[in-house]
Amino acid sequence: MSSTDIWISNDASTFQKAQLPTQLRHVKVIKIREDSIGRIILLISTEITNEENADPDLSEIFISDSQGLKFSPVEWTPNHQFGNFRLTFPDFLKGTIFGSFHPSIDYSNHQVNYTENIAGGETKISVDNGLTWSNLKVVDEENADSFGCDITRPERCSLQGYFYNLKLSNPSAGIILMTGSVGDDNEFDRKDRKTFISRDGGLTWRVAHNSSGLYATGDLGNIIVYIPSPSYKDGDVQSKLYFSLDQGRTWNQYELVDALFYIHPLELINTTPDGSGSKFILSGHLITTASQEGNNTNISYIARSVLYAIDFSAAF
């Protein structure tokens, strides 16, 4: 297979061939981004190939010089041969990038086992526009014993976000929430997902809730609203909303529905795009259960859609 070239134009008219650190074969450019100082970031992901004697490259991140013509690899190379990168650039934290790598699964192998466990990836943070990267350090003495590794060794025990949903909370003054698990980069159990909070722009993290769910911030991070996702497998239905008025240090709860229903949340947003407001919208479905005649099991069904307006204007 011939190599792939990258062409750059600074005037939308003439193009120059980019200088790459290696030839690109069996790869695809997932996304092209610009950092906060104008450099180009390329996400290069390796494709699985059946060609004999193929020598595929590792998935990499390339970052350009100030002219956008000469690219160098980022010093972050996961120990996987195939995989995909995803980068998240918080608009409210200039220079900060969250990166998540997830190894590819070869579906041609019919021996693949589908379990609650998922192949481990790597999640890292850069605060200098991608020049250097570090693991997401967990600083949470209260919950340290609940993790399967030693959080005092962040190089081997750190917060790992989920590649398909590296979702950060709304804009705030360094207050970020993220769903993930704590471990190394080997394997993660979906049932271990928790919601974590950082108050320093993503450098250190601690547990906010022992479940995954929807979250949004308001008043630039002083207000946090959280509603857990229901766990139907364990019979853990959801009817409560949690909120914090002190950046997630303490939490209160509010009963959304009566005992006849529980809620399946779909979306939770702050009505102010810049995250400064104190009003939120929660949408979802009200779920109820009923037993069928001649059937000992209960059947769940949607009673109706529901929309909540949540206002903390009078909270301060």
From Swiss-Prot:
The keyword Phosphoprotein does not apply. The keyword Ligase does not apply. SUPFAM superfamilies: Oligoxyloglucan reducing end-specific cellobiohydrolase. Keywords: Repeat. BNR repeats lie at residues 62-73, 124-135, 196-207, 242-253. It comes from the Eukaryota. One of its GO terms (cellular component) is membrane. This is Uncharacterized protein YCR100C. The lineage of its organism: Eukaryota, Fungi, Dikarya, Ascomycota, Saccharomycotina.
